[in-house]
């Protein structure tokens, strides 16, 4: 089938060349794996085209030991070739055999079996088989070392989790405080497993003491906090956090009370205008209710800071003579100044309608004689109140009646210029203002 018996010495050199080329190539293919050489490439006895090395001189002999000879010769030639040369030498058996064989020498089954190994990529080159035990043993040794190191690292990592790591800071503090005090700590929440912080459950006795302390002091100093911590069997941190939360709750309650108790329109931002613009408006923090009132502040101390600004007290504490240019605008026949009663710093207008006047330090709108607004500024606090005394009557039944005033002049300019005169100074003196 493969070779005819008539091929003799004429074809012997070609056969030896082909045999040499062929036995180099099976060494390359043997590098893929010794056990799969017979199965993958079909180096079986019926398909073997060339004689083995033992029967190289006799071409007429059979080929019983071809597979064994390939397996024995492959390890000897495999170390000489690299993995990069395997790709280039895969076609050498087909080309060498087709050139030297002369058509009839190349079996059809060999080409069909040599072409399928081309598409799969070549595996990495094997280690030199001269010492097959050492590298083989070295690789598992490395793997075992890596496995041992990984297992040892995992064991060390698992061993590094100590029981004190599972406890939080607060739990350890609670345990320490329980151990030092020797009392029962059942009122506190039990320490959870590996939790960040537990919610503190205060007893009723602790809450009573904390509320009592908060009623007197909203901010605790550290000595008092230490004392409370020892008294209530709590930590300083717990007491500090409780006071912070209690202050926030108090602030929220105050905001809610302010919104509920002050209806719309009675906030300081919506305060009414002055009495000259609104005829029947008065501030009755200390006055009895008048029928024309529109603003009744429920708590005057709450608006103590805005009272001087709301009603312009700074304008009323000025010297009395500064108001003369304002009254110079009225006609002369209608303006009848009254003499000062017992040197009291006050004047009123009888014929003027809707003109603001001073009556002993009380601002009176003469548009409504009996029920008009009265701005009693005696209760207001002002920086200049030391030199100005508002001590006159609040209610004035008529425009021509003056309340009992202080016998001593309260305005410094009045005592300097108007004490000797019975009438007010002439208006032209103050035209330069």
From Swiss-Prot:
Q: Where is the composition biased (Pro residues)?
A: 116-132
Residue ranges of the region described as Disordered: 44-198, 258-280, 401-433
| Residue numbers covered by motif Antp-type hexapeptide | 161-166
Low complexity bias locations? 146-159
Q: Quote the DNA-binding region ranges, renumbered to this chain.
A: 195-254
User: Which key words tag this protein in UniProt?
Assistant: Developmental protein, DNA-binding, Homeobox, Nucleus, Transcription, Transcription regulation
Q: Which GO terms describe its biological process?
A: anterior/posterior pattern specification; cartilage development; cell-matrix adhesion; DNA-templated transcription; embryonic skeletal system morphogenesis; glossopharyngeal nerve morphogenesis; Notch signaling pathway; positive regulation of gene expression
Q: Where is composition skewed (Gly residues) in this entry? A: 97-106
Identification of the protein by name: Homeobox protein Hox-D3
What's the source species for this entry? Mus musculus (Mouse)
Identify the taxonomic lineage of the organism of origin: Eukaryota, Metazoa, Chordata, Craniata, Vertebrata
